[in-house]
Each structure stands twice: as structure tokens, then as C-alpha cells.
Design a protein with these regions (language model features):
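Nucleotide 5′-phosphate-binding alpha/beta core
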Residues: 1-56, 61-79, 83-87, 91-93
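Conserved adenylate-forming
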Residues: 5-8, 109-143
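General N-terminal targeting signals
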Residues: 41, 52, 83-86, 107, ...
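Short acidic, glycine/Ser/Thr-rich loop/turn "cap" segments at secondary-structure junctions
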Residues: 62-69, 93-100, 134-137, 142
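Alpha-helix capping and helix-loop boundary segments enriched in small/acidic/polar residues
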Residues: 72, 102, 124-128
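Loop/helix-junction capping segments adjacent to catalytic residues or to phosphate/diphosphate-binding pockets
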Residues: 75, 105-106, 131
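Conserved AMP-binding loop of ANL adenylate-forming enzymes
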Residues: 86-122
Length: 143
């Protein structure tokens, strides 16, 4: 039952069939329609009781596209975002002010998870309210 969509798309393909870059190009992509078809929890490869969080698109072009996150997904997401900060030259001594949106979309949560995993002071302000941003920037020395 789990991830029937992938099983159907991949057909008889097996990991051993992928030997070259050209073989990878033959694999089907996950499309917007794939995500919408399984709404509200599309493309699960675990029981839905293992889903800890969902994020979704705004739904402006149709049904929302939902991404379901397990504990492992959240941990991996935090690690990837922390790695981005490291590669950008930041250090845990930096103070990061998260100015992107929080809510259904994944941006705010992802930036915050990454900051915390990275070990930097995190100030989750969100978008807008320039006065608060400026005050916190001055008060905390946001880098």
C-alpha cells in the first residue's frame, strides 16, 4: 500500500539497473500532479503514524502540494540547512535572524532548524515589521 505511486512509475526497475548517468536520466521525475494525486498525504513510504509534520504550497495553482516529514526527514533537513550555513562561511558564533515566513510553507521552519542544528543563536522573527527587525539587529548584533 505504501508508495503505490512510486511502485507503478518505476515498474520493473531495480537499483542494479542503474549503472550509468544515462540510466539515471530514464527514471521518472516526481511531478506536481504526483503530489496532488495523493492529497492529503502523497507518496508516503512509511505509515502515516510516522509523519510528524506537514508543509504545503499555497495552493494558488490548484490543490495544495503537501510534503510529509518523518523524524528522520526533519533531522536530515536540519543537517542540510546547517551545512548550507557552514558552506556560506558562517560560524556558531554568528547570530542569525530568520526573516522569512513561518506557516505551511517550509522556509521559516527550515532556516530555524538549520540555525539550531548549526549551533548559532537563532532569532525567529518572520517577515515584515521593519521596526522589530532593526531593533533586534541592533540589540543582538545579528550577523
Amino acid at each position: 500500500r505504501l508508495c503505490r505511486q512510486y511502485r507503478a512509475k518505476l515498474g520493473d526497475a531495480h537499483p542494479g539497473d542503474i549503472r550509468t548517468l544515462d540510466d539515471v536520466r530514464k527514471l521518472p521525475f516526481t511531478t506536481t500532479e504526483d503530489l496532488r494525486a495523493g492529497y492529503p498525504l502523497p507518496l508516503l513510504s512509511v505509515p502515516d503514524t510516522e509523519v510528524l509534520r506537514v508543509h504545503a504550497s499555497s495552493g494558488t495553482t490548484g490543490k495544495r502540494k503537501v510534503l510529509a516529514y518523518t523524524r528522520n526527514d526533519i533531522d536530515t533537513f536540519a543537517f542540510q540547512m546547517a551545512r548550507c550555513y557552514e558552506l556560506a562561511g558562517l560560524t556558531p558564533a554568528d547570530r542569525m535572524q530568520v526573516a522569512v515566513g513561518y506557516g505551511l510553507w517550509t522556509a521559516g521552519a527550515g532556516f530555524q532548524l538549520g540555525c539550531e542544528k548549526f549551533g548559532a543563536l537563532t532569532i525567529p522573527v518572520g517577515p515584515g515589521n521593519l521596526d522589530i527587525h532593526l531593533q533586534l539587529l541592533q540589540d543582538f548584533g545579528t550577523t
